[in-house]
Regions:
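Acidic, PIN/NYN-like endoribonuclease modules and their adjacent C-terminal/linker elements
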Residues: 1-2, 109-140
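Histidine- and aromatic-rich ligand-binding microenvironments
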Residues: 5-6, 37, 100-102, 123
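Active-site phosphate/pyrophosphate-handling residues
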Residues: 8, 45, 106-107, 133
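A generic structural signal for short hydrophobic patches within well-formed alpha-helices
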Residues: 10, 41-44, 127
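Active-site neighborhoods of divalent-metal-dependent phosphate/nucleic-acid chemistry enzymes
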Residues: 46-52, 70-118, 122
Length: 140
């Protein structure tokens, strides 16, 4: 099984004291079965760039550049034409039901749907509404 890690999973693992349930779950997964979307990397970059504390921003930038990107080398899901076509269908499904999706989450959902992956996230609601397999390691 392939797992697509949401931004909040990587952020949680960066914390000085990550949630033990999340650590336990991630430790059960083979690294080669874990993937990230390029949208996740963009969300991380955005979060880093808005930090006003320069030393903290530099530390997080080093984490992204020297740890996360190399760790997921060859396992970053790009945004392709097929993923964008799936994204557009999901946008339309949401419109018909009166739901507006978070765009980074919807791109991640479209990526998971296209590649047959399960999303690992704390915020399942967007992914449930997009009808993609999702697991929240914070839940029992």
């Amino acid at each position: 099984m392939a797992w697509l890690l949401d931004t909040n999973i990587l952020s949680e693992l960066r914390r000085s004291r990550p949630e033990p349930k999340v650590l336990s779950f991630i430790e059960t997964l083979p690294l080669e079965h874990m993937f990230v979307s390029v949208a996740t990397l963009a969300e991380l970059r955005y979060g880093i760039e808005i930090i006003t504390d320069a030393p903290r921003r530099a530390d997080l930038n080093a984490w992204l550049t020297n740890i996360i990107r190399p760790m997921f080398d060859q396992r970053v899901i790009p945004i392709t034409e097929d993923i964008m076509l799936k994204w557009r269908l999901l946008v339309e499904e949401g419109r018909k039901t009166g739901h507006t999706f978070s765009q980074p989450d919807l791109i991640i959902a479209a990526s998971a749907a296209h590649h047959g992956m399960t999303v690992v996230t704390r915020d399942r609601s967007q992914f449930d509404k997009a009808h993609v397999p999702v697991i929240n390691p914070w839940e029992p």
